[in-house]
Amino acid sequence: MNQGYTQLSAPELKETKTSKLNKMNNFRSSPIAEIINKIPPDCGKIQNTTFPEFNPALRRRQHEQWPAYEKPIRVTDSMSPQLSSINCLPNLYPHGTLPLPNPYLSYLNHIEKVNCQDVKFSNWSVLHNSNNGFEIPTYFSPRTTQNMPCSEKVESWLERLPIFVGFDGYLFTNCFDYEYMLDWEETEFTFEKTSCMETDYSKALTDTDIIYIQEKKIEALIRNQYLKEYEFSQKDF
């Protein structure tokens, strides 16, 4: 009797043989056996493989066909310590080579992405000067009125300015006091017009006066709104 079964009884030996036969039958009926049978016997030989990792001749021919800017370089000890440390990774880089990116191709890819921007803003920039041939686009208008001449803009501004002319020809600027309500301008102009208010004062104002009046108007509205805001204190908590 075989020495391997000296410790087994007859029922146990029969059960062991039956289990081995069942395993063999299951393996033969599985797709694994069919796949293994299709593998050629010389698959493990290096000279017949089609993978460059295991075929030096194929890997050398593939290296010669690469473009010059994509060919990997040999990492030597004369290079920086960061690059030479790659030689310590034989599993990742068995031949000490590292493909470097091409700066020119990276620049072309960047230009291609930039050109895919919105057409409305691709040809215009705040940094462009008047000598580069670009013109201000028609949609760029800080005012609601499109393509209004500068003279008409100034006259339109003057018509909406809350200016009050005194009897001695002085301009009253106390209308910009922050204690007025937000609708102080509408309230002032609801009164009956007098000869003093009907005076044509637009021609007597300079650009500096217009800017000053607009500045005071905006400042008064901001201060009025600031005083209306409620500030939290420690008593609220």
UniProtKB/Swiss-Prot annotation:
Protein name: Prospore formation at selected spindle poles protein 1
Record function comment: Involved in the pathway that organizes the shaping and sizing of the prospore membrane (PSM) during sporulation. Required to localize MPC54 to all four spindle pole bodies, and localize DON1 and SPO14 to four prospore membranes.
GO biological process, one term: ascospore wall assembly
Subcellular locations according to the entry: Nucleus; Cytoplasm, Cytoskeleton, Microtubule organizing center, Spindle pole body
Keyword annotations of the record: Cytoplasm, Cytoskeleton, Nucleus, Sporulation
GO cellular component, as recorded: cytoplasm; nucleus; spindle pole body
